[in-house]
Amino acid sequence: MKRTRQMGLRLLGVALCMTALCACAAEAEPTADELFAKRMDNAFDPATIDVIGDRLTDWQVERLDDLTYLRNYRNNIADRRGWVHGAMYVGIFNWAALPGNERHYEPLLKIAEEEKWLLGDRLFHGDDHIVGQMYLSLYNREEEKDGEKIDHTIRQLNTIMAADPQNSLEFAGDGIRGVGRACQIRWCWCDALFMSPQTWIMLTAATGDPQYTEFADKEFWATTEYLQDPETHLYFRDSRYFTQQDEEGNKIFWARGNGWVYAGVANILRILPQDHPSYAKYLQLYKDMSKTIAGLQHGNGFWRVSLLAKEKYESPETSGTGFMTYGLAWGVNEGHLDAETYAPVVRKGWNALVSAVQDDGMLGWVQPIGAAPDSVFETDSQLYGVGAFLLTATQMMRFDD
């Protein structure tokens, strides 16, 4: 009788173990493919965000050697030291910095070495400074610093400081091949505020020389005084748009242009010491822009390519939306923005961005290169759009409102 009872207990134990094993098998972790396929159902799940970010990065990096698939392809898009690539590098570096994502440093380091750690060819042009942000970020990761990797950046910025251009910021005259407009030896267009000042501030951190930050600070506020609309706190792309209006009679504020500025200010706040005399001023600018930007989001979660448009430009657009969502998410994460007010805007923006990710990993609905609101299609992609998306994804990995 006793042996029968013991045998029964053993069988019961085996049965319970088998049941537990079956339950564990039934609850196996979903694969990356499964997470990606259901990305819209679990867009805020960190595991899903991780898969989406990896898919976008891999898709784009695999195609860097041939960009002719892009609508409105131009030869300068292939310039790996230019702003189109540079904006992508900023996003990939932030994504690679997350635990477990270190493999994404490899293509950045390969490009830096192949390009000999050189800035772009145009000495003064802000667009050709953004690649320096990648160089300095990679340099900062080194345990034993190799100063030669940032020598060219130092020499170029020293030359600019010594010249200290004082020209007008008016965007006038014909462009000069290889240089741009005459005014572009300074930051006379709002995009430049994402491309250049961060490189200067990062160089101060790398060298200990405050002159670089002071120069960037001076030029940033000169551009802001010139291009910012005091009523809306938004930026005109350049002086050509001061008096222009759209078909509805609105001032023309380009979404990606303001995205460049807004994300650029967030990036400055991330690297500028909080005891710097201008830190509070940047933070106030950031908060003022946040209030305006949050109020201009549309019901589908996107911002229109022309921010004040009510009827026109109804198509989604992901580069402006990416930079806006990134800036807002960062502010909520850092406690600079009220979560109750801004977290719903961030969530709508992130859902919108995820909806634009195609099944092969391509990000669609990215407005092609331009300087103003324009048409955009689902099949449009661009490297800077991926950069904006990855900046946002990095913040969404720790977004907990």
Regions of interest found by a model, annotated:
Residues L35-G86, F93, L98-Y105, E114, ...:
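CBM-like carbohydrate-recognition segments
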Residues K2-L12:
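Bacterial N-terminal signal peptides that target proteins for export
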Residues C190-D191, I201-L307, E314-T325, L337-P368, ...:
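Extended ligand-binding clefts on enzyme/binding-domain cores
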Residues Y105-L109, W117-F242, E247-I252, D360:
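Extended ligand-binding groove/face enriched in aromatic
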Residues F36-A37, Q198, L269:
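Acidic/histidine-rich, surface-exposed loop or edge segments in extracytoplasmic proteins
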